[in-house]
Regions:
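Bacterial N-terminal signal peptides that target proteins for export
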Residues: 1-12
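Bacterial N-terminal signal peptides
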Residues: 11-20
Length: 264
Protein backbone atom coordinates (compact mmCIF):
# COMPACT_ATOMS: atom_id res chain seq x y z
CA UNK A 1 0.00 0.00 0.00
CA UNK A 2 1.28 3.47 -0.85
CA UNK A 3 2.07 5.52 2.22
CA UNK A 4 -0.47 8.37 2.49
CA UNK A 5 2.04 10.65 4.19
CA UNK A 6 4.45 10.09 1.30
CA UNK A 7 1.69 10.95 -1.20
CA UNK A 8 0.84 14.09 0.72
CA UNK A 9 4.49 15.21 0.75
CA UNK A 10 4.81 14.50 -2.98
CA UNK A 11 1.66 16.48 -3.74
CA UNK A 12 2.92 19.38 -1.65
CA UNK A 13 6.27 19.38 -3.45
CA UNK A 14 4.54 19.32 -6.84
CA UNK A 15 2.32 22.23 -5.82
CA UNK A 16 5.35 24.23 -4.66
CA UNK A 17 7.19 23.47 -7.90
CA UNK A 18 4.18 24.55 -9.97
CA UNK A 19 3.87 27.74 -7.96
CA UNK A 20 7.56 28.50 -8.42
CA UNK A 21 7.33 27.98 -12.18
CA UNK A 22 4.22 30.17 -12.29
CA UNK A 23 6.00 32.92 -10.38
CA UNK A 24 8.92 32.89 -12.79
CA UNK A 25 6.77 32.60 -15.90
CA UNK A 26 5.89 35.78 -17.73
CA UNK A 27 4.55 36.34 -21.23
CA UNK A 28 7.24 38.75 -22.38
CA UNK A 29 10.30 38.91 -24.63
CA UNK A 30 13.20 36.73 -23.51
CA UNK A 31 15.37 38.67 -21.09
CA UNK A 32 12.52 40.64 -19.52
CA UNK A 33 12.01 39.30 -16.00
CA UNK A 34 9.19 39.83 -13.52
CA UNK A 35 10.94 42.65 -11.67
CA UNK A 36 11.48 44.55 -14.91
CA UNK A 37 7.85 44.01 -15.91
CA UNK A 38 6.72 45.22 -12.49
CA UNK A 39 8.68 48.45 -12.99
CA UNK A 40 6.73 49.47 -16.10
CA UNK A 41 4.32 52.29 -15.15
CA UNK A 42 0.66 51.33 -15.54
CA UNK A 43 -0.06 54.29 -17.86
CA UNK A 44 2.50 53.12 -20.44
CA UNK A 45 1.33 53.55 -24.04
CA UNK A 46 4.58 52.85 -25.89
CA UNK A 47 7.11 50.23 -24.81
CA UNK A 48 10.48 49.44 -26.32
CA UNK A 49 13.30 47.07 -25.52
CA UNK A 50 17.00 46.74 -26.36
CA UNK A 51 19.14 43.66 -25.73
CA UNK A 52 22.25 45.69 -25.00
CA UNK A 53 24.66 42.75 -24.68
CA UNK A 54 23.67 41.40 -28.09
CA UNK A 55 23.60 44.86 -29.67
CA UNK A 56 27.15 45.64 -28.53
CA UNK A 57 28.32 42.30 -29.96
CA UNK A 58 26.84 43.08 -33.39
CA UNK A 59 29.33 43.93 -36.17
CA UNK A 60 27.09 46.90 -36.97
CA UNK A 61 27.25 48.42 -33.48
CA UNK A 62 30.26 50.68 -34.27
CA UNK A 63 28.30 52.04 -37.24
CA UNK A 64 25.34 53.20 -35.14
CA UNK A 65 24.92 56.98 -34.86
CA UNK A 66 27.13 58.48 -32.11
CA UNK A 67 24.01 59.68 -30.28
CA UNK A 68 22.73 56.10 -29.98
CA UNK A 69 26.06 54.82 -28.68
CA UNK A 70 26.34 57.76 -26.28
CA UNK A 71 22.91 56.84 -24.87
CA UNK A 72 24.10 53.30 -24.14
CA UNK A 73 27.47 54.29 -22.66
CA UNK A 74 26.22 55.20 -19.13
CA UNK A 75 24.53 51.78 -19.13
CA UNK A 76 27.65 49.82 -20.10
CA UNK A 77 26.97 47.41 -17.21
CA UNK A 78 23.38 46.82 -18.38
CA UNK A 79 22.39 43.79 -20.42
CA UNK A 80 18.76 44.74 -21.16
CA UNK A 81 16.97 48.07 -21.42
CA UNK A 82 13.25 48.83 -21.44
CA UNK A 83 11.93 52.25 -22.45
CA UNK A 84 8.36 53.04 -21.38
CA UNK A 85 6.41 56.15 -22.37
CA UNK A 86 2.96 57.46 -21.53
CA UNK A 87 3.14 59.82 -24.51
CA UNK A 88 4.71 62.59 -22.43
CA UNK A 89 7.44 61.15 -20.23
CA UNK A 90 9.89 58.30 -20.80
CA UNK A 91 11.38 56.06 -18.14
CA UNK A 92 14.31 53.72 -18.77
CA UNK A 93 14.40 50.42 -16.89
CA UNK A 94 17.78 48.68 -16.98
CA UNK A 95 18.78 45.20 -15.86
CA UNK A 96 22.49 44.61 -15.41
CA UNK A 97 25.51 44.03 -13.22
CA UNK A 98 25.12 47.17 -11.14
CA UNK A 99 27.14 47.46 -7.94
CA UNK A 100 25.60 50.90 -7.54
CA UNK A 101 23.11 53.00 -9.46
CA UNK A 102 24.38 54.26 -12.84
CA UNK A 103 24.83 58.05 -13.07
CA UNK A 104 21.45 59.78 -12.82
CA UNK A 105 19.59 56.52 -12.12
CA UNK A 106 17.88 55.04 -9.06
CA UNK A 107 18.55 51.47 -7.95
CA UNK A 108 15.16 49.84 -7.38
CA UNK A 109 16.50 46.38 -6.54
CA UNK A 110 19.84 44.59 -6.92
CA UNK A 111 20.75 44.79 -10.60
CA UNK A 112 17.67 46.85 -11.51
CA UNK A 113 17.86 50.60 -12.14
CA UNK A 114 15.43 53.22 -13.46
CA UNK A 115 16.06 56.68 -14.83
CA UNK A 116 13.93 59.42 -16.36
CA UNK A 117 11.91 62.43 -15.26
CA UNK A 118 11.15 62.60 -11.52
CA UNK A 119 7.49 61.78 -12.16
CA UNK A 120 8.23 58.79 -14.38
CA UNK A 121 10.75 57.39 -11.90
CA UNK A 122 8.24 57.73 -9.07
CA UNK A 123 5.63 55.94 -11.19
CA UNK A 124 8.05 53.10 -11.97
CA UNK A 125 8.99 52.65 -8.30
CA UNK A 126 5.35 52.78 -7.19
CA UNK A 127 4.42 50.12 -9.75
CA UNK A 128 7.39 47.97 -8.70
CA UNK A 129 6.16 47.99 -5.12
CA UNK A 130 2.85 46.44 -6.23
CA UNK A 131 4.71 43.46 -7.69
CA UNK A 132 2.35 43.47 -10.68
CA UNK A 133 3.20 43.63 -14.37
CA UNK A 134 2.56 47.23 -15.45
CA UNK A 135 1.85 46.51 -19.13
CA UNK A 136 1.00 42.81 -19.59
CA UNK A 137 -0.73 43.33 -22.94
CA UNK A 138 2.18 45.25 -24.48
CA UNK A 139 4.72 42.70 -23.25
CA UNK A 140 2.60 39.86 -24.60
CA UNK A 141 2.38 41.60 -27.98
CA UNK A 142 6.16 42.05 -27.98
CA UNK A 143 6.96 38.45 -27.00
CA UNK A 144 6.83 36.93 -30.49
CA UNK A 145 7.82 40.10 -32.35
CA UNK A 146 11.06 40.44 -30.36
CA UNK A 147 12.13 36.81 -30.75
CA UNK A 148 15.72 36.72 -32.06
CA UNK A 149 15.88 40.51 -32.45
CA UNK A 150 17.88 43.02 -30.42
CA UNK A 151 15.57 46.04 -30.72
CA UNK A 152 11.78 46.17 -30.52
CA UNK A 153 8.92 48.57 -29.85
CA UNK A 154 5.15 48.16 -29.43
CA UNK A 155 2.48 50.83 -29.09
CA UNK A 156 -1.22 50.92 -28.33
CA UNK A 157 -3.31 51.93 -31.32
CA UNK A 158 -4.22 55.55 -31.89
CA UNK A 159 -1.42 56.81 -29.64
CA UNK A 160 0.47 59.76 -31.17
CA UNK A 161 4.16 58.94 -31.45
CA UNK A 162 6.63 61.67 -30.42
CA UNK A 163 7.84 62.30 -33.98
CA UNK A 164 8.00 65.36 -36.24
CA UNK A 165 8.54 66.17 -39.91
CA UNK A 166 7.82 63.45 -42.45
CA UNK A 167 7.78 60.88 -39.65
CA UNK A 168 4.55 62.49 -38.42
CA UNK A 169 2.82 60.57 -41.24
CA UNK A 170 3.15 57.56 -38.95
CA UNK A 171 0.56 59.03 -36.59
CA UNK A 172 -2.01 59.36 -39.37
CA UNK A 173 -1.17 55.84 -40.52
CA UNK A 174 -1.59 54.33 -37.04
CA UNK A 175 -4.74 56.24 -36.10
CA UNK A 176 -7.15 53.30 -36.58
CA UNK A 177 -4.89 50.51 -35.35
CA UNK A 178 -5.40 48.38 -32.27
CA UNK A 179 -1.67 48.08 -31.80
CA UNK A 180 1.53 48.35 -33.81
CA UNK A 181 5.05 47.08 -33.35
CA UNK A 182 8.47 46.93 -34.96
CA UNK A 183 11.59 44.86 -34.32
CA UNK A 184 15.13 44.96 -35.69
CA UNK A 185 17.83 42.33 -35.89
CA UNK A 186 21.40 43.45 -36.48
CA UNK A 187 23.94 40.83 -37.47
CA UNK A 188 26.20 40.87 -40.49
CA UNK A 189 23.15 42.41 -42.16
CA UNK A 190 19.84 43.83 -41.01
CA UNK A 191 16.27 42.54 -40.71
CA UNK A 192 13.26 44.73 -39.88
CA UNK A 193 9.76 43.39 -39.17
CA UNK A 194 6.79 45.70 -38.56
CA UNK A 195 3.26 44.65 -37.62
CA UNK A 196 0.02 46.59 -37.28
CA UNK A 197 -3.41 45.28 -36.31
CA UNK A 198 -6.40 47.32 -37.46
CA UNK A 199 -9.48 47.76 -35.29
CA UNK A 200 -11.49 46.12 -38.08
CA UNK A 201 -10.75 44.23 -41.29
CA UNK A 202 -11.58 47.40 -43.22
CA UNK A 203 -9.12 49.37 -41.08
CA UNK A 204 -6.48 46.75 -41.85
CA UNK A 205 -7.13 47.10 -45.58
CA UNK A 206 -6.93 50.90 -45.39
CA UNK A 207 -3.70 50.67 -43.41
CA UNK A 208 -2.14 48.49 -46.12
CA UNK A 209 -3.26 50.85 -48.89
CA UNK A 210 -2.02 53.94 -47.04
CA UNK A 211 1.31 52.29 -46.25
CA UNK A 212 1.85 51.37 -49.90
CA UNK A 213 0.93 54.92 -50.94
CA UNK A 214 3.35 56.50 -48.45
CA UNK A 215 6.17 54.24 -49.59
CA UNK A 216 5.46 55.04 -53.25
CA UNK A 217 5.52 58.78 -52.55
CA UNK A 218 8.71 58.44 -50.53
CA UNK A 219 10.37 56.51 -53.35
CA UNK A 220 9.30 59.17 -55.87
CA UNK A 221 10.66 61.94 -53.65
CA UNK A 222 13.97 60.07 -53.35
CA UNK A 223 14.49 59.61 -57.09
CA UNK A 224 17.98 61.15 -56.88
CA UNK A 225 18.95 58.58 -54.25
CA UNK A 226 18.76 55.23 -56.06
CA UNK A 227 20.04 53.33 -53.02
CA UNK A 228 17.10 54.63 -50.96
CA UNK A 229 14.62 53.83 -53.73
CA UNK A 230 15.98 50.29 -53.97
CA UNK A 231 15.55 49.82 -50.22
CA UNK A 232 11.96 51.08 -50.29
CA UNK A 233 11.05 48.83 -53.21
CA UNK A 234 12.51 45.81 -51.41
CA UNK A 235 9.99 46.14 -48.56
CA UNK A 236 7.60 43.19 -48.51
CA UNK A 237 4.00 43.91 -47.40
CA UNK A 238 1.31 41.32 -46.72
CA UNK A 239 -2.10 41.41 -45.04
CA UNK A 240 -4.20 38.77 -43.30
CA UNK A 241 -7.62 40.10 -42.30
CA UNK A 242 -6.87 42.88 -39.74
CA UNK A 243 -3.11 42.26 -39.56
CA UNK A 244 -0.59 43.93 -41.85
CA UNK A 245 3.08 42.96 -41.84
CA UNK A 246 5.96 44.70 -43.55
CA UNK A 247 9.48 43.32 -43.67
CA UNK A 248 12.85 44.39 -44.97
CA UNK A 249 16.09 42.45 -44.97
CA UNK A 250 19.47 42.94 -46.52
CA UNK A 251 23.18 42.36 -46.15
CA UNK A 252 25.90 44.64 -44.87
CA UNK A 253 25.52 47.10 -47.76
CA UNK A 254 21.78 47.51 -47.12
CA UNK A 255 22.46 47.96 -43.40
CA UNK A 256 25.01 50.67 -44.16
CA UNK A 257 22.51 52.51 -46.37
CA UNK A 258 19.80 52.34 -43.72
CA UNK A 259 22.10 53.49 -40.93
CA UNK A 260 23.20 56.46 -43.04
CA UNK A 261 19.54 57.57 -43.13
CA UNK A 262 19.38 57.76 -39.32
CA UNK A 263 19.90 61.35 -38.06
CA UNK A 264 23.35 61.80 -36.55
Amino acid sequence: MVNRAHLARSAALLALAAAAISCRSINAPAGVDREMAASIPADTLILGGVKLDELRASPLYPKLPPAARALAEPLRDARYLLLASNGKDIVAIARGRFREAPPGATLVAPGLAVTGSPGSVRAAIAQYKTGRNGAPDLLARAASLADGRQIWMVARGGVPLPVTGNAANLNRLLRDTEYAGIAVRLGSGIEIEATAVGRTAEAGREFEENLRAILSLTAAASARQPDVVALIRSIQIRREDRTVRASLSGGAAAADRLLRLVPR
